[in-house]
Amino acid sequence: MDLTGRRAVVTGGASGLGAETVRALAAAGAEVTVATRRPLSAEPLVQELAAAGGAGRVTAEALDLSDPASVESFARAWRGPLDILVANAGIMALPTRTLAPNGWEMQLATNYLGHFALATGLHAALRDAGSARIVVVSSGAHLDAPFDFEDAHFARRPYDPWVAYGQSKAADVLFTVGARRWAADGITVNALNPGYILTRLQRHVDDETMRAFGVMDDQGNVKPLPYYKTPEQGAATSVLLAASPLLKGVTGRYFEDNQEARTVQGQEDQPGGVAAHALDPEAADRLWEYGTDALRAA
């Protein structure tokens, strides 16, 4: 895998899955920008990779996905073509309904709307690359949470942390379907489920829930279950979608464990898969319009 001369942006690339993605892309020769709310948090990674003497240069820039002004500033400051955009940053299961300053529910703002704004803001740079790729980190949580167009921000329905998270991840998958309109520009967009991994993503999950998931004992010790992946293993599918020549021209798909996932209709005994509601072209087009209107009103 040779990415020499390619330029990449990885959101949330300072730790966890994002950091492993940055390491892999930089090792292959890509010039990588870590887009993070606190650029100083990425300094250890930047220094680590500089000391390693890899081919790809790594830098960090400020980006707050929940703030449209921050996203616009990042996109406006970008110069030249962009070959790879990895929409990796995310938050999960905020215990109470939290709103971004413009009124967006925070999980939807960070996980979907912010990335939609970033991708559309960088569209010209992606187009100019000739064969750019957008990689969207979704989650199996999308399976049971279709996007609610009537009350996406929980203004009227009771707030549920996991429904809010799942809805935002369903939106991520729908974005890949809606982005088929960019295929003529040479831009492919695919989503993935990285699997079960313990990272800072779980920082808002309370101890009771962690115990119910089986990953915390009575003494408060966190222990991954046998089927959990390491961050490096979880990032493998992101790197595959970002760099593998086998996926040239492939767009609007959902992957897990380095292969395209099967489509499922709802809850099934067998885990995994991608929900049919997240691949619905009509819902994808409707969401694209929803996102465009939301950005216009922000």
Curated annotation (Swiss-Prot):
EC numbers, comma separated: 1.-.-.-
Pfam families xref list: adh_short
Signal peptide annotation: none
Keywords: Oxidoreductase
Single GO MF descriptor: oxidoreductase activity
Sites where the protein binds NAD(+): 9-33
Family stated for the protein in its record: Belongs to the short-chain dehydrogenases/reductases (SDR) family.
Coiled-coil regions, chain positions: none
Root EC class: oxidoreductase
Protein name: Probable oxidoreductase
Keyword Amino-acid biosynthesis on entry: no
Active site: 165 (proton acceptor)
Residue positions binding substrate: 139
Organism superkingdom: Bacteria
